[in-house]
Regions:
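Residue-level recognition of alpha-helical structural elements
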Residues: 23, 27, 90, 94, ...
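A short secondary-structure junction motif
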Residues: 11, 41-46, 83, 108-111
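C-terminal peripheral helix-coil segments that are non-catalytic and often amphipathic
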Residues: 74, 78-86, 115-158
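Hydrophobic alpha-helical bundle segments that form small-molecule/ligand-binding pockets
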Residues: 71-105, 112-116
Length: 158
């Protein structure tokens, strides 16, 4: 199972890096694409998440979350630094902010430690978007796309 999860994470990180390396995209577009892609439901990712967070797999789930945080934060840090040059972000701690935001997201929303229902989960996602704006010095509403799809479509955000 570890090898399957590692391959899945490798694929996700390669996709994120390809977006980050695109010189034609603004930091805003890169961040949007990576964060929206990571929030998309897909059968394989959902199955792996459920197996990794099953009872008895806590160690595997913790290693998976740590791997995602450690591998995705430098990619997002580069995008934050680009955004700082473009004037959309302003922070003294781009790497640390991304590590903390990713860790919170992974643990609170994907770790299986909490059984948030749709409305509760939506509130957590809204709070995370608000925190990201504050931590990265972005304008109010900058990260609303993290939850607008669920609000607009009335979708379940489980």
């Amino acid at each position: 199972m570890d090898a399957v999860i590692a391959r899945y994470i490798d694929t996700e990180m390669e996709a994120a890096q390809a977006i980050a390396d695109n010189p034609q995209m603004s930091a805003e577009e890169k961040m949007f694409r990576i964060l929206r892609a990571s929030g998309q439901d897909n059968a394989r990712g959902d199955r792996l998440e459920k197996e990794a967070s099953a009872v008895g797999n806590a160690d595997m789930q913790q290693r998976t979350m740590a791997s995602i945080v450690l591998r995705l934060s430098p990619i997002l840090e580069g995008i934050v630094r680009q955004g700082m040059r473009e004037g959309i972000f302003q922070t003294e701690y781009p790497r640390e902010c991304m590590e903390i935001l990713l860790a919170a997201s992974e643990f609170m929303l994907h770790g299986g430690a909490f059984a948030w229902e749709g409305a509760q989960r939506l509130q957590k996602i809204k709070a995370l978007a608000w925190m990201a704006e504050k931590a990265l010095g972005a304008k109010k509403g900058h990260f609303n796309y993290l939850y607008e799809k669920f609000e607009k479509d009335g979708e379940n955000c489980d």
